[in-house]
From Swiss-Prot:
EC code(s) of this entry: 3.1.3.48
Enzyme class of the recorded protein, top EC level: hydrolase
Encoding gene (name): cdc25-3
Pfam families documented for this protein: M-inducer_phosp, Rhodanese
Alphabetical UniProt keywords: Cell cycle, Cell division, Hydrolase, Mitosis, Protein phosphatase
UniProt-recorded Gene Ontology molecular function terms: protein tyrosine phosphatase activity
PROSITE patterns cross-referenced by the UniProt entry: RHODANESE_3 (PS50206)
Protein name: M-phase inducer phosphatase 3
The species this protein was found in: Xenopus laevis (African clawed frog)
Superkingdom, taxonomy of origin: Eukaryota
Cellular component, GO, one term: nucleus
Region of interest called Disordered, as start-end residue ranges on this chain: 95-117, 304-354
Gene3D superfamilies to which the protein is assigned, alphabetical: Rhodanese-like domain (3.40.250.10)
Substrates-to-products reaction catalysed: O-phospho-L-tyrosyl-[protein] + H2O = L-tyrosyl-[protein] + phosphate
GO annotation terms (biological process): cell division; G2/M transition of mitotic cell cycle; positive regulation of G2/M transition of mitotic cell cycle; positive regulation of G2/MI transition of meiotic cell cycle
Length: 572
């Protein structure tokens, strides 16, 4: 009986990536020597049966084997930096300690025994890039679909040495091994032009291979590209056609425009980085012409940092004022302040077309100066509006009262107005202790309102001559509070006792400055010639007592009689 020991049919030797199938027939008995060819065929059939039972793919096919460059192209079929997909596997850089790149080697069986004469049983491949399953599935993949699988970017390989005799032929096996084993220069660029790829990957007739690959096959990615500059190789490659590739036509029928202009901003970058770098740049410069097109009427609370600081914008919201500055508000104000007594010069102006409405006369249309002049004319008249004031008057603190100076009072006392005045009365409205401290000669001390009312209105006095007048003059210490109150009280009572405008005492006066200003200048007209102020230290109790009586008398009078106040009315 024959015992067989089958080694793994696809075993990599020395990390060179060469996969071969070995079979060793160990027999306890010597093999038959009659027909050695039949024995070999029998052994091969047994090996094939074992492989089929274990679902293993055959390493050889009736098609031509892969050349090193073809295997390299198939290995990088999944390497595409422009597809935007994440690589399925990263490059293992643990074996890259040496500067030389990993070199493809031939199978150990051929190197040792050399029994495999047919080129169909020999192919070269990188370790980790091609598995036996791929060769089995290659028949199922159509060649037409491989154009999308072909990478736009090839891995970096050593640059070829320039040959003195011209371009090296790939059919020369000695030169082929020399090209891949002894790189003497830096790695070349990754993105090869189309004609270079065609020239370097064109196989010889004896090494023609039909390659097909499934898009779903999992491939190991060696690494990322290094540069995008194409290498400079000697030789003319324009005469080489795509149909000479014999199996590579579908793979390398890449558009030249797509190869020259990568679909990204940078050819050796991924899709996301290419989109970022090839996108429109944001310009930070702002042109003034573009800014001027923006509406200037729009208010901006915050200025954008990218906008320039100085823009040709007006300072006001309305930079150009209208030519016609006559607004309805201004016209109304001008008409309200105009006088109706103005000359009719404005009528000469051309009238506006259309119906014009005439404004009714109101107090605002009357000139205020004419009203004041008219009032001044009435103010010169006495209380019953029958005559003018006999004594010269001055303005004082209270506009409704008539003031005279101390000089006028002294002249009246000296008899300078006897032709006009029949009799005059000087009423001292101060408290009794003030009156006793010093007062004007012939003055009456009446510090309460009821006393003044009883004295003048119970039995009214009349002048003996119609041309003569009765004059009453009020004063207090300063003629600021008590004297004006007493004067107004008498006028109110007099108005209440007569029909308007008749009065018993139409001519009332108030001494300006009071006794305080009159005493220093006319002491001879005062008796005793002294001055006692209201807030004297010796008369505090008297001050409180008289104030209380004055308030009580005023309250009683208001309760007895109805109150007739003429606040703000002219008293004459």
């Amino acid at each position: 009986m024959i015992k067989e020991r089958v080694t793994p049919p696809f075993q990599a030797s020395g990390g060179s990536g060469v996969v071969m199938a070995e079979s060793h027939i160990i027999s306890s008995e010597a093999p038959p020597k009659s027909n050695p060819g039949l024995n070999i065929r029998t052994n091969c059939r047994m090996i094939l049966n074992l492989l089929r039972e274990k679902d293993c793919s055959v390493t050889f096919s009736p098609e031509q084997p892969l050349t090193p460059v073809t295997d390299l192209a198939v290995g990088f079929s999944n390497l595409s930096t422009f597809s935007g997909e994440t690589p399925k596997r990263c490059l293992d850089l643990s074996n890259l300690g040496d500067e030389t790149a990993p070199l493809p080697t031939e199978s150990p069986d051929r190197m040792s025994s050399g029994k495999l004469e047919s080129p169909k049983t020999q192919f070269v491949q990188f370790d980790g890039l091609f598995t036996p399953d791929l060769a089995w599935k290659a028949k199922k993949c159509p060649k037409r679909n491989m154009n999308s699988v072909l990478p736009h970017l090839l891995c970096s390989t050593p640059s070829f040495k320039k040959a003195s005799g011209g371009q090296r032929s790939l059919s020369n096996k000695e030169n082929e091994g020399e090209l891949f084993k002894n790189p003497n220069c830096k790695p070349v660029a990754l993105l090869l032009p189309q004609e270079v790829v065609d020239s370097q990957l064109s196989p010889t007739p004896e090494n023609k291979v039909d390659i097909s690959l499934d898009e779903d096959c999992e491939m190991n990615i060696l690494g990322s590209p290094i540069s995008a500059d194409p290498p400079c190789l000697d030789g003319a490659h324009d005469d080489i056609k795509m149909q000479n590739l014999d199996g590579f036509a579908d793979f390398f029928s890449v558009d030249e425009e797509e190869m020259e202009n990568p679909p990204g901003a940078v050819g050796n970058l991924s899709c996301s980085m290419a989109i970022l770098l090839s996108g429109p740049l944001l310009n930070q410069d702002v042109e003034i012409s573009n800014v001027n097109n923006i509406s200037l009427n729009r208010s901006r609370l915050y200025r954008s940092p990218s906008m320039p600081e100085k823009l040709d914008r007006p300072m006001l919201k309305r930079p150009v004022r209208p030519l016609n500055s006559e607004t309805p508000v201004r016209v109304k104000r001008r008409r309200s302040t105009s006088s109706p007594l103005q000359p009719e010069e404005e009528n000469c102006q051309p009238q506006r077309r259309g119906t014009s409405l005439k404004k009714t006369l109101s107090l605002c249309d009357v000139d205020i100066s004419s009203v004041l002049d008219e009032d001044c004319g009435h103010r010169q008249l006495i209380g019953d509006f029958s005559k003018v004031y006999a004594l010269p008057t001055v303005t004082g603190r209270h506009q409704d009262l008539r003031y005279i100076t101390g000089e006028t009072l002294a002249a009246l006392m000296h008899g300078d107005f006897n032709s006009l005045v029949e009799k005059f009365f000087i009423i001292d409205c101060r408290y009794p202790y003030e009156y006793d401290g010093g007062h004007i000669k012939s003055a009456f001390n009446l510090h309460r309102q009821d006393e003044v009312t009883d004295y003048f209105l119970q039995q009214p006095l009349t002048p003996l001559m119609a041309q003569k007048r009765l004059i009453i003059i009020f004063h207090c210490e300063f003629s600021s509070e008590r004297g004006p109150k007493m004067c107004r009280s008498l006028r109110e009572e007099d108005r209440a006792s007569n029909d308007y405008p008749s009065l018993y005492y139409p001519e009332l006066y108030l001494l300006k400055g009071g006794y305080k200003d009159f005493f220093p200048e006319y002491k001879e007209l005062c008796e005793p010639q002294s001055y006692c102020p209201m807030h004297h230290q010796d008369f505090r109790e008297d001050l409180l007592k008289f104030r209380t009586k004055c308030k009580t008398s005023v309250g009683d009078r208001k309760r007895r009689e109805p109150e007739f106040r003429l606040t703000g009315q002219r008293l004459g």
